[in-house]
Amino acid sequence: MSTIGYIGASICLLGVLSSLFSISHIVRDINSLRDEVEGRVDEFKVLADDTWQRLLVLQSPTGETENVMPSIFRSKRFVYPGMCNCDSNSQGCPAGPPGPPGLPGKRGDEGVVGDLGRSGASGISLAAVHHIPGGCINCPAGPAGPPGQQGPVGPQGFPGVVGTCGPSGDDGQPGPAGPLGDKGAQGPKGFDGADGPDGMPGTAYFPGAVGQPGEPGWLGQPGLPGKHGEPGQDGEEGPKGAPGTPGSNGRDAYPGQPGKAGEPGAVGKDANYCPCPARRDSKTESVHEPPAASQNGGYRKAKRH
């Protein structure tokens, strides 16, 4: 598997783990919300039952409550509700006068201190559910509780209405003199002014006597080079000079090319030669004598025909 595959698998695994963590967090929040809702429902049931009992007491003429929900067990004989115990045969009997108040009963024993109840529901919602006349039940105000902790900072309020413009302020004191500004641009040339009045005539002076000659001045700087002059005329030929010293011998020349072949010569005359000696018989042993030598080496020039 390539590196890209490992990276993709790692990303998928992280996504699955984050999803499982988010699901567990959501389930925990849902369970806590369910417990809170059930607690509020139980509180509402308790308040509803208490309010119903109070309404029954207000509606009963004797101030006693009637057992609306009969017991599931068998009731005793001749036990009736505390509201009325009239004869069953009487029909339309008027109510009798109220009896004298009974003797005050003995003070009962103090009950055990009960557990602290849960926080009650909002009075406005209770009045809306049970239609209590006059709105909320008028209960005596309890003692002031201890000051609570400082609450969190509330949300930012809406922008306020734009206020009216205030009166104009007084003129401020003159500030210190600022630094000198930059030199401005040169203005346009002005018009020529009018001619002024003639001046007073000047004093006439006569030329004075000639002064003594001054000292020689310093040498001036060298002048610029002059232009080239025109070429002069050729001079006359001078006398012949004495002969010079002989020069040294020159180097040998390179060998020349071979000459052409000469023409063939004329045919020469035949040379003279000595005649051969006479032969002898073969049977006779003889010794040939050499021919006499001649001045031409034994041969003579022969003539050519």
UniProtKB/Swiss-Prot annotation:
Residues 150-162 have a biased composition (Low complexity). InterPro entries: Col_cuticle_N (IPR002486). Residues 96-125, 142-204, 208-252, 256-270 are annotated as: Triple-helical region. Residues 278-288 have a biased composition (Basic and acidic residues). Keywords: Collagen, Cuticle, Disulfide bond, Repeat. One of its GO terms (cellular component) is collagen trimer. One of its GO terms (molecular function) is structural constituent of cuticle. Residues 95-117, 146-305 are annotated as: Disordered. Disulfide bonds: none annotated. Pfam families: Col_cuticle_N. The keyword Disulfide bond applies. The keyword Cell wall biogenesis/degradation does not apply. Belongs to the cuticular collagen family. Collagen polypeptide chains are complexed within the cuticle by disulfide bonds and other types of covalent cross-links. Nematode cuticles are composed largely of collagen-like proteins. The cuticle functions both as an exoskeleton and as a barrier to protect the worm from its environment. This is Putative cuticle collagen 90.
